[in-house]
Design a protein with these regions (language model features):
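S-adenosyl-L-methionine-dependent methyltransferase catalytic module, highlighting the catalytic core
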Residues: 4-27, 31-47, 183-251
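N-terminal juxtadomain amphipathic helix
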Residues: 19-105
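Residues at structural and domain junctions
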Residues: 35, 64, 156, 175, ...
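Conserved phosphate-coordination/catalytic loops
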Residues: 84, 180, 246
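Conserved SAM-binding loop
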Residues: 101-222, 249-251
């Protein structure tokens, strides 16, 4: 994997121009996959899986697509680990760039996902949590039964109940866009990180926008939608989790 450090929107545009030929090759691959799916309900392609540390097959299908273009970010499911393209990419970056040790203390903003299970199987000191949007007693009982004997830990990323300076790494994948006060959440993350600790996060990102799109706001518990509501997958809720932002160059 080639990892490029880009600090602002101008550097991103320069990167696109310099790597135009390679980007055309990648878009050509995308085009071929989108053409093939028109005549196949689903199919597999061969490749190397970082999380499996071996060759694997990857599922291509139309789930989460917009009807015109495949959602390769959320699909390309590894046949061995069952992790999607985005998650495998994040772990590839995490382990290649940061080189974590097995005993490092890691906090993840997820607990019941396939990734959380994979991380706990590999690393010795992983702490995970979920955020209960529905904190009614009935919902908590349903979750208790569903995930028994595991105990789901609730954390609000804007007010974590951890001591300061305790984690080597914090991993948060597609979480911050669901937090109205995401900058407050970032401050909390840096509070619980050790000196020289590192945060790795992913968010849905509009590569063509220099500013954030505010999709919804919340005041005194009342949500005001500014665009068509967008919900992302949530393992704790069938409804999904409301996205308050599509982040851009000003995030």
């Amino acid at each position: 994997m080639h990892i490029n450090r880009i600090s602002n929107f101008k550097e991103y545009q320069s990167h696109i121009q310099k790597n135009n030929r390679q980007i055309k090759v990648l878009r050509g691959i995308d085009f071929k996959l989108n053409q093939k799916i028109k005549t196949h309900k689903q199919f597999y392609i061969d490749g190397y899986s970082w999380t499996a540390q071996s060759n694997s097959k990857f599922l291509v299908d139309t789930l989460y697509s917009n009807g015109n273009e495949l959602n390769l970010r959320e699909r390309l499911i590894c046949n061995k680990t069952k992790l999607n393209n985005r998650i495998r990419g994040c772990i590839h970056v995490f382990e290649t760039l940061f080189k974590p040790q097995l005993r490092d203390k890691i906090y993840m903003t997820e607990q019941v996902s396939l990734l959380a299970k994979w991380m706990n199987n590999k690393y010795d000191n992983v702490v995970g949590s979920e955020c209960f949007e529905d904190d009614t007693l009935m919902h908590k009982i349903k979750l208790l039964v569903k995930y028994f004997p595991s105990k789901i830990k609730h954390q609000d990323l804007t007010k974590l109940n951890f001591n300061s300076d305790i984690f080597n790494y914090v991993l948060s994948f597609d979480c911050f866009e669901h937090i109205p006060q995401y900058k407050k959440a970032l401050k909390e993350v840096f509070r619980v990180l050790k000196p020289n600790g590192k945060l790795l996060f992913s968010v849905p990102f509009d590569l063509n926008s220099q500013s954030n799109l505010v999709r919804a706001t919340i005041s005194e518990g009342e949500i005001k939608h500014l665009t068509t509501p967008e919900y992302h997958g949530d393992p704790l809720s069938k409804k999904g989790c409301l996205s308050f932002y599509t982040l851009g160059g000003s995030c």
